[in-house]
Amino acid sequence: SEWLEFRRVLFRSPCDEKETEEIIKYVANCDGPCYVRLGRLAVDSVNSSNYKFEFGKGVTLREGNDCTIITTGSMVQVSLEAQQKLKAEGINVRVINLHTIKPIDTEIILKAAKETGKIVTVEEHNVVGGLGSAVSEVICENHPSLVKKIGINDIFGQSGKPEELFKEYGLTSDKIVKTVKSII
């Protein structure tokens, strides 16, 4: 959470093996401090083999007009699972992968806020000072919209297996589905 306060430090959180590879290549040639957040779990591939990382630019993975899920890192796969469940119920949500948290892609966030009017952020991190806070700040200052944050609620975490911790802290596709339904 306090990491976003560091000046000139660039923050990235890849969602799969291909994005991790592209980000590491970018970081290797970066002049200045970088922070790359990696999870412990193996995750399914989200990006195609010809994916090219673009510094500071989020990626729209699924289109939708009812709500937007903005996510990062290992929560991308969980968010895509939620998107599929919602789609089966006739709810069309946009899913955006913000692999670069600092600097944040204000353009993709504001486009989503203007087009869907409702945002759910999902992160495997403290919502205070993390992705949810950064997205909320962009929206509040430029295009006020409803934002709900899913993540760790400013408490000390526990140790354990990632799957158990995700369930403990509500970092599940079912929680995302419930949150989206509560705001549309």
Language-model region placement:
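Single conserved hydrophobic/aromatic residue that forms the stacking wall/gate
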Residues: 1-10
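Acidic-residue sensor for enzyme active/binding pockets
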Residues: 2, 19, 123-124
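Mid-sequence acidic-hydrophobic segments that form the walls
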Residues: 7-8, 26-30
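Conserved glycine-bearing catalytic or ligand-binding loops at nucleotide- and phosphate-handling centers
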Residues: 14-28
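Thiamine diphosphate
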Residues: 30, 34-184
